[in-house]
């Protein structure tokens, strides 16, 4: 229902757990998804080599940023964000993407079962009205959500204020991030520093 809902996990055990099982399942889903993405892109006239996309992932899970970089490399878009706007973040693409997702409750509960803390990442991406977002955060808090990412480069001042208010309303901790995924994945985003109270993660 919420197309860009991301859950971050902190301080979880890396041993066998429902979370490790879920991650293994998701890797399998992502591996199958890449072939459907290739078919989708070709149907739009974007013909790129899958081998180049896989090479960017360096043996890891292939994601949309890898596709975006290769799309740019082959001249179909001028920048990664254009590749997302035109193909990789459209309603039509989400119909493909949604078949490979896991619901938020499963994610939160898996992180918690592994002894970790769960945070809702970059809430602005869900493009929800304030009341709808508040209801969603309340629902996630009921599943055991620990925090909400209030500080993020693309959050406006008004959005940041709203998220801080929601954190207070639902008794959630505050996290922040730059969305840095490495130079090969998101070369236009640099690792940033942010001072926050993080004793709750220990």
Model-derived regions, located:
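Short, glycine- and charge-enriched coil/turn segments that flank and shape catalytic ligand pockets
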Residues: 47, 55-62, 130
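Charged catalytic cores and adjacent phosphate/nucleic-acid-binding surfaces used
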Residues: 1-14, 26, 78, 106-120, ...
